[in-house]
Amino acid sequence: MSTIAESARIHPMAVVEDGAVIGEGVKIGPFCHVGPHVVLHENVELLSHAVVAGRTVIGKGTRIFPMAVIGGDPQSVHHGGEETTLSVGANCTMREGVTMNTGTADFGGQTIVGDNNLFLANSHVAHDCKVGNHVIMSNNVMLAGHVVIEDRVILGGGSAVHQFTRVGRQAFVGGLSAVSYDVIPYGMLNGNPGLLSGLNVVGMTRAGVDRAVIHRVRRAYKSIFEGTGSVRENAAAIRDEYADCEQAVQILDFIAADSDRALSSPTRGQKG
């Protein structure tokens, strides 16, 4: 039997299956479908024809627009019907036609989306992805399985991210770009194949990063990608010099971390 809060408003032409948990202030419009294992926290709003399926939890204040399908089975040949999950944080917006899939059992079974994210029309979050907070995915952005998107990333319209790829904090990916390799924090990537084109200085400035700090991060970037060694060797060589610069350290830590993918770079042949 469903648990439906007294203040929830459910249109008589919506379907809420037995077992669903509907929180206070939730609004469910006509022709919506809410599955039996779904939890909608307070003040979630489903506009007409939205679908929330699977073992999915939607955080408070999130809005889901028409024709979005949230919590569908993973699009993976390895999925055997296991009970995997999708967790979406608070105050997200999923515009028309957005799709998000649950995880796969072989990789922990969880797709996780953070808070305050904006997913524009027809964008897709595949199985086992991890999306941070304050992320913007523009129209028709596609995340393949196991992708990690860190906080405050902006992905331009029609861009596609290869499976297992990481996109670092506050990076900016231009429209129609193909992201085949990891993108450093604060990096800007454009094109197909995607290449770094410098730092997201506009984003850093908007975030209140001091101009002198931005100048230091630019110097670090130049040392990393224009030094005589590999990218990882160059990054390790400057760690002590930039130990007091938070943004530079984030870049250096990202480069040093284990990853299934190589690093995006400013030139096609350089991969870390």
UniProtKB/Swiss-Prot annotation:
GO terms for cellular component: cytoplasm; membrane. Pathway: Glycolipid biosynthesis; lipid IV(A) biosynthesis; lipid IV(A) from (3R)-3-hydroxytetradecanoyl-[acyl-carrier-protein] and UDP-N-acetyl-alpha-D-glucosamine: step 1/6. Its main location: cytoplasm. It comes from the Bacteria. GO terms for biological process: lipid A biosynthetic process. It catalyses: a (3R)-hydroxyacyl-[ACP] + UDP-N-acetyl-alpha-D-glucosamine = a UDP-3-O-[(3R)-3-hydroxyacyl]-N-acetyl-alpha-D-glucosamine + holo-[ACP]. Pfam families: Acetyltransf_11, Hexapep. Its EC number is 2.3.1.129. The keyword Transferase applies. The keyword Transmembrane does not apply. One of its GO terms (molecular function) is acyl-[acyl-carrier-protein]-UDP-N-acetylglucosamine O-acyltransferase activity. Keywords: Acyltransferase, Cytoplasm, Lipid A biosynthesis, Lipid biosynthesis, Lipid metabolism, Repeat, Transferase. PANTHER family: ACYL-[ACYL-CARRIER-PROTEIN]--UDP-N-ACETYLGLUCOSAMINE O-ACYLTRANSFERASE, ACYL-[ACYL-CARRIER-PROTEIN]--UDP-N-ACETYLGLUCOSAMINE O-ACYLTRANSFERASE, MITOCHONDRIAL-RELATED. Belongs to the transferase hexapeptide repeat family. LpxA subfamily. Homotrimer. Involved in the biosynthesis of lipid A, a phosphorylated glycolipid that anchors the lipopolysaccharide to the outer membrane of the cell. This is Acyl-[acyl-carrier-protein]--UDP-N-acetylglucosamine O-acyltransferase.
